[in-house]
Amino acid sequence: MATLARLQARSSTVGNQYYFRNSVVDPFRKKENDAAVKIQSWFRGCQVRAYIRHLNRIVTIIQKWWRSFLGRKQYQLTVQVAYYTMMMNLYNAMAVRIQRRWRGYRVRKYLFNYYYLKEYLKVVSETNDAIRKALEEFAEMKEREEKKANLEREEKKRDYQARKMHYLLSTKQIPGIYNSPFRKEPDPWELQLQKAKPLTHRRPKVKQKDSTSLTDWLACTSARSFPRSEILPPINRKQCQGPFRDITEVLEQRYRPLEPTLRVAEPIDELKLAREELRREEWLQNVNDNMFLPFSSYHKNEKYIPSMHLSSKYGPISYKEQFRSENPKKWICDKDFQTVLPSFELFSKYGKLYSKAGQIV
């Protein structure tokens, strides 16, 4: 109890002392707090920096191990690809070697067999020799036949020439040109002429008509008719000696038929005739002349509307009024247009000019 009384008596002083002590300690408390905060901030900064350095070391180690793992994995893939490429190249080289050996064996055995080709060439050479001998014999036979035919042809030609020149044979009174007295012996042609017979020409057989009609007589006496070689009577005279042309050929050349020019042969109104012919063919093909004829009762109540050209007060222009031939006074010169083209001189002379030998120029 005494202690309680003592403490109660001292309670007022304790409160004052507590307040005084706290007021004295407040400045030191703030300084100590600032110092503690500074120390804690420095310590925590050191702790954080140390932890960051630790994390950097750990991250570096992790990255090193991870990158080494990726590098080893990539290297393994590269090694596998290189190994696969090397093996494929080796397999290809081996396949090429096998194919080369097999193809060489196949070509040597089946395609280019040396011994078979040697036998084949031997047989071919023997066959060629036999064919060459047969061809040589055939060529010699053909050459002999050709020489024989040429000799026969020359003999016939000489015989015909001798028969043709039989008039040059010498007589008892007059020697011929091949039997000159200045020669020691006569020419071989003299003996050929003596063996040959004179050439005789066969006269063409002309059938003479017993009676001639009036039309034939008019055709013969017309202005444009010419005598023909086939209807001429035979001329009873001696055959002329010499290399002359045949009489029928000369007469055909002399009395050849009329050859009109292009201007005379082609009609002037050919275009008009062609148009009329075309119009006639179209008219023959038509089933109905009035192709677009309307119904019979359709146009009864329809009002007629004249055209502006016909209903004008000036009137229509006449059809031939604008033609050049209707107004000769308006011509610049007195001559009209030439409607027909002139003929070509070169074409008109075709087949009409002959040389002295009778050939066409």
Curated annotation (Swiss-Prot):
The keyword Transferase does not apply. The keyword Cytoplasm applies. Keywords: Calmodulin-binding, Cytoplasm, Repeat. PROSITE patterns: IQ. Transmembrane segments: none annotated. It comes from the Eukaryota. It holds the Pfam family IQ. Residues 32-61, 55-84, 91-120 form the IQ domain. One of its GO terms (molecular function) is calmodulin binding. It is found in: Cytoplasm. GO terms for cellular component: cytoplasm. This is Spermatogenesis-associated protein 17.
